[in-house]
Amino acid sequence: MSTQTTKILVFSHRPEVRETIITAVGRRPAPDLPRVDFVEAGAIADVLYEVDNGTVDLLILDGEAQPTGGMGLSRQLKDEITNCPPIVVAVRRKDDRWLATWSQADAVLVHPLDPLTAAETVADVLRRVPVVNG
């Protein structure tokens, strides 16, 4: 049995949004992938610290976070970080998916989160990239 894990950072200024995302994705988004360890970030500084240290395999950013939203943060990270980890942005409305595309996000989740869709989306993104934290 493998002891490898995948580290996912979940960013939102609201703890209940982070919890909703974590619950929807689950600790094992797919049987062929390692278990997930979640890191919660409530501030931009926390996200930047983890990304700068290269310790996360995937970021899930709340598009509605305040004062800086996940879409703007995604765009900044993709523009400024070499080998930026993949990013999934969670938006409130389906109509906001185009903004997530602008943000260079690798995938989009739409609230209310469906656990099957959330896990499948995250699994698809994780399958495209090597795990760096394991």
Whereabouts are the PLM-identified features?
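Acidic, metal-coordinating helix/loop segments flanking the phosphotransfer/catalytic sites
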Residues: A41-L58
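His-Asp phosphorelay/catalytic-motif detector in bacterial-type signaling
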Residues: I81-P86
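Two-component signal transduction core modules
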Residues: L59, V108-L109
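Alpha4 helix (beta4-alpha4-beta5 surface) of REC/receiver domains from two-component response regulators
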Residues: R92-V108
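Short hydrophobic/Thr-rich beta-strand motif most characteristic of the beta2 strand and flanking loop
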Residues: L33-G42
